[in-house]
Amino acid sequence: MVSASPRGDSLQRAVSVAYSPGSTFKVAQAIAMLSEGTLSPTTQYSCARGFTQGGIHIGCHAHTSPRAVVGALGTSCNAFFCKSFMDMIGNAKYRTRAEAIDRWHAYMSSFGLGRCLGTDVGPEATGLMPSADYLKRVHGQWTPQTIMWVGMGQGEVTATPMQLCNLAAVIANRGYYYTPHLCRATPDHPIDLAYRSKHVAMGTPQAYQITIQGMRAAVVSGTCASINRAAYAICGKTGTAENEGEDHSLFIGFAPMDKPRIAVAVVVDNGGFGADMAAPMASLIIERYLTGRLREYSKYQVEHWAGQAVTPYVPPTDTAKAVKAPTAKKHKARHK
């Protein structure tokens, strides 16, 4: 994906730009917490259109409460994932908070997040998954509340669209991936071994299955119900990431549910809610790949999107500035 921004750059945004993943990141959180046993499939957290912690309010949208993890993924509950993430970091099974966050970091790294994947499209941005050392450098003394926004994919986490697509592939495969690449093998140029080697991710089979159920719930009756199809079962997760200017619109998913053939990630700069732009675009990609054609209504959607160019936000100055960790006041309700 090459930028057509007013900057006139030629960035390969699929691999060279890292975004806040927003609520798409909740699937990675679910696998880690379920696998570690700090969250059970039946654990419920309440949400009254958000929650307040230490005088800070994190918003959410209206949905039934309390929720267990499948329902929380389906409705993209911010309260559930912030609370459960804080409970993981503060869990007594770990000797220290540093041990807990580093264990969490190991899961994220095994999914291909926070590091270069080694794809043949580049240059790659690493993204960021905070470790204990990173948090100590940035915050000094920190608590689970300091980083609670990480639970819902905001704060100090970033990922490239390729990394998010790879995350979808990890889940579709129930726990493994192959390094993404574009070049196919030819008789004279076989595929490099690096692209044929299986990478096994952390996580229990049950954790993957429950997370997949949550992603399916999001499509059947949750935040991306508009892309549900009778012909094939899509599993997905929307995201809306805060940003200067309009929010970014995100979606990750795969299909079919039981014998997946395609994993997709869509990021629309300044596109607004994930359910409004990224998810419908992803559904068109999935439909064309699985069926070899587009329905008439889908063709209409393509024409509609073609006329809906989104102009990325351009700051008033090009002066380079250090990236600063988001502050508590910035975070509002972002779920779709």
What are the functions of these language-model segments?
Residues 1-23, 28-274, 316-336:
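Beta-lactam-recognizing serine transpeptidase/beta-lactamase-like catalytic domain environment
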Residues 297-323:
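Short, highly charged C-terminal tails/helix-capping segments
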Residues 258-260, 272-296:
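C-terminal, active-site-flanking charged/polar segments
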Residues 91, 182, 266, 284, ...:
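Short C-terminal domain-edge/linker segments immediately following a structured domain
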Residues 63-65, 128-129, 287, 297-302:
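Short, intrinsically disordered/low-complexity patches at protein termini
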